[in-house]
């Protein structure tokens, strides 16, 4: 495999590992321009918006993690299938309500695409794909 493809795969592996340890400065550094496009249609564009997304998603699940199942590179895209894990330890905003911590854990299967500009190993967009109700069901909510 070419060097650029290997560097892109490593960038994604590093990005995901840094998310587990909540090293947000280092996660941001994996981007050329931080941007998340969610399956729900929500877009977090720019460092401030992405940091806000990190804070909001980690408040209910401060131990949120991921376990890579498969990773592949094609063109300017890296695709990852992974387990998303976490424990409901903080308030969760769900359907206009705030759900107090249950202490329950979840493990749901997800996928994400990571887009790169031509010739670069810096991410320009992460697009996570998941069933929005999967975590709620796993938590019994």
Language model features by range: what are they?
Residues 1-141:
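C-terminal and inter-domain tail/linker signature
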């Amino acid at each position: 495999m070419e060097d650029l493809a290997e560097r892109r795969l490593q960038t994604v592996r590093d990005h995901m590992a840094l998310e587990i340890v909540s090293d947000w400065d280092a996660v941001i550094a994996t981007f050329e321009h931080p941007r998340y496009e969610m399956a729900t249609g929500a877009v977090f564009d720019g460092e401030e918006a992405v940091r806000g997304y990190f804070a909001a998603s980690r408040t209910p699940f401060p131990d949120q993690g991921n376990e890579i199942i498969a990773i592949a590179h094609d063109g300017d895209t890296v695709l990852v299938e992974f387990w998303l894990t976490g424990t409901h330890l903080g308030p969760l905003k769900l359907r206009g309500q705030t759900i107090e911590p249950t202490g329950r854990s979840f493990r749901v299967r997800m996928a994400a695409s990571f887009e790169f500009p031509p010739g670069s190993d810096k991410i320009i967009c992460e697009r996570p794909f998941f069933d929005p109700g999967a975590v709620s069901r796993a938590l019994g909510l």
